[in-house]
Amino acid sequence: MSYWLCITNRDNWKVVKEKNVWGVPRRHENTMKRVKPGDKLVFYVKQESRKGEVLEPMIVGIFEVVSEPYSDSTKIFKSHTPGETYPIRVKIRPIKIGEVKFKPLIPKLSFIKNKKKWSGHLMGKAMREIPEEDYKLIESLL
């Protein structure tokens, strides 16, 4: 079993929860091909500004993968890139939903090597594998 940190925004987090599906752009297909049924997905929502308010980055849920990756271009996710549908998808089921602030976790997460420039470990990625010890820490706090 593998553990993955899935990086999204609040709009698409709502879609994930409602539809029990996770999707990534085609350029991340090689990463998604490594995802297997039984793997755990930890969802991270990025820091965002909404109406002048800064919404902190958070861990918001853990899901289990229940399908092999598949392709579906049905537009369910929001994207800033015209025509992007996040077509490489897996079906998932919820394990835990909650909110844990991400910044206080940074010193404790082993996959983040550079604690000062931590966002570099997440930028440009849709998802990344994380060690079991980091998964267990996050799960215990959610």
Curated annotation (Swiss-Prot):
Name the Gene3D superfamilies for this protein: ph1033 like domains
Stored Pfam families: EVE
Taxonomically, the superkingdom here is Archaea
Q: What start and end residues bound the annotated signal peptide?
A: none
Q: Which family does it belong to?
A: Belongs to the UPF0310 family.
**HAMAP family, A to Z:** UPF0310 (MF_00771)
The protein depicted here goes by the name UPF0310 protein PYRAB08750
Q: Which organism is it from?
A: Pyrococcus abyssi (strain GE5 / Orsay)
